[in-house]
């Protein structure tokens, strides 16, 4: 799981600091040996671009192969990503299914749809509920829900 300090297609104005987000991810995945947080982008110049990260990881771990996994809702803007053609030609693109009724991608994007249950919970939903002062209990692991809700960032 690669944590990005700043998505080039989004404003960083309303974003928690990198360390807080990293800590929350570590808390959530601590009991799963198959998941690991990667903070390599923290030291990259901003904005960080996916193709640079994948190239860097390939150089660090030449005996490993990597795929890019993103949510189906993100596929519509994939052709806006910097060097998206390089990504498509160099790494497999896997897409996690979402209940998504938005527009189709502007250009066809070859990808593999992961065979997984559709989960209606998204980071966008969680951020929206926190910003509105609504509970996120049962949407995130128990170990995290109170910490998130009580964080000064969400209490204004």
Which residues make up each language-model segment?
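Nucleotidyltransferase catalytic core that binds NTPs
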Residues: 1-156
């Amino acid at each position: 799981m690669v944590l990005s300090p700043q998505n080039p297609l989004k404003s960083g104005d309303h974003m928690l600091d990198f360390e807080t987000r990293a800590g929350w991810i570590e808390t959530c995945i601590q009991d799963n040996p198959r998941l690991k947080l990667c903070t390599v982008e923290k030291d990259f110049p901003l904005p960080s671009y996916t193709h640079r990260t994948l190239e860097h990881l390939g150089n660090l771990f030449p005996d490993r192969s990597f795929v890019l996994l993103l949510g189906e809702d993100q596929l519509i803007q994939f052709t806006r990503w910097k060097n998206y053609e390089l990504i498509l030609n160099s790494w497999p693109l896997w897409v996690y299914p979402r209940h998504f009724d938005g527009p189709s991608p502007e250009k066809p994007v070859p990808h593999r749809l992961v065979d997984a249950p559709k989960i209606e919970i998204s980071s966008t939903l969680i951020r929206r509920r926190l910003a509105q002062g609504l509970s996120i209990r049962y949407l995130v692991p128990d170990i995290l829900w109170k910490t998130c809700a009580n964080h000064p960032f969400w209490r204004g």
